C-alpha cells in the first residue's frame, strides 16, 4: 500500500476541472506511475527480495488509476478497480484507442447505488463500468475479468470490497 499527497492530482491520468467541489484533477497520474516503476517497486524488490508478479489495486479514483496503468505499462500482472471512477471525462475515448500492455487478470466492482445519483457526471459510472468490462472481455491480453456489483453506494464496505478483489485475483493464479 502507498499513499499520495494529493488524491485528485496524483491519481488522475490527465487534467480535468473538478466534477464536484473545487479540487481540480491535476493529471499527475503519469508522475505517480513513474514513481511506482522507478522508485517504489525497485526498492521493494531490493529490500524484500520481491521477484514475482505485481498486482495493483485501487478504490475510487485510485481504482481508475490502477486500470489506467494496465494501458500504460506492462509491469502489473493483475489489476483491481474497486468502485473505480470510470465516470472520468474522456475515459471512454481513451480505452477505445489503447490496448492492455500485459497479460492480466482484471477485477472491476461497483456499488449498486453508485450510478443512482443526481450528479450527471457521476451517474454514468455504471454504464461506463459495464462497457469497460465488455472491452476487457474482448481484449486478447486479458486472461480473466469480472464485474461484481456490491450492495450500497460508493463508500459502503470499502475494505470488504478490497478484500474481495484480492481474493478473486489470487484465485485466478
Language model features with spans:
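Serine-hydrolase catalytic machinery in alpha/beta-hydrolase-like enzymes
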Residues: 1-35, 39, 43-47
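Active-site nucleophile loop of the alpha/beta-hydrolase fold
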Residues: 3-6, 80-88, 111-114
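Short, surface-exposed alpha-helical segments at coil->helix boundaries
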Residues: 30, 34, 38, 122-134
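Short beta-strand immediately N-terminal to the catalytic nucleophile in serine-hydrolase-like folds
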Residues: 53-58, 82
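Gly/Ala-rich beta-loop-alpha elbow adjacent to hydrolase catalytic centers
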Residues: 57-62, 66
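Conserved hydrolase catalytic core segment
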Residues: 68-77
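Flexible "cap/lid" loop of the alpha/beta hydrolase fold
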Residues: 85-103
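C-terminal catalytic histidine-bearing segment of alpha/beta-hydrolase fold enzymes
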Residues: 109-115, 126, 130-133, 137-173
Amino acid at each position: 500500500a502507498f499513499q499520495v499527497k494529493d488524491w485528485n492530482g496524483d491519481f488522475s491520468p490527465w487534467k480535468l476541472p473538478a466534477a464536484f467541489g473545487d479540487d481540480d484533477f491535476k493529471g499527475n497520474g503519469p508522475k505517480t506511475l513513474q514513481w511506482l516503476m522507478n522508485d517504489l517497486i525497485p526498492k521493494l524488490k531490493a529490500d524484500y527480495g520481491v521477484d514475482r508478479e505485481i498486482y495493483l489495486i485501487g478504490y475510487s479514483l485510485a481504482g481508475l488509476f490502477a486500470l489506467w496503468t494496465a494501458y500504460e505499462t506492462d509491469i502489473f500482472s493483475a489489476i483491481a478497480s474497486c468502485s473505480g471512477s470510470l465516470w472520468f471525462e474522456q475515459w471512454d475515448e481513451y480505452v477505445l484507442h489503447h490496448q492492455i500492455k500485459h497479460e492480466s487478470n482484471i477485477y472491476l466492482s461497483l456499488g449498486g447505488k453508485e450510478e443512482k445519483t443526481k450528479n450527471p457526471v457521476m451517474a454514468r459510472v455504471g454504464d461506463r463500468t459495464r462497457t469497460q468490462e465488455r472491452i476487457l472481455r474482448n481484449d486478447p491480453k486479458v486472461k480473466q475479468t469480472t464485474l461484481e456489483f456490491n450492495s450500497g453506494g460508493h463508500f459502503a464496505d470499502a475494505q470488504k470490497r478490497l478484500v474481495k478483489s484480492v481474493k478473486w485475483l489470487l484465485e485466478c493464479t
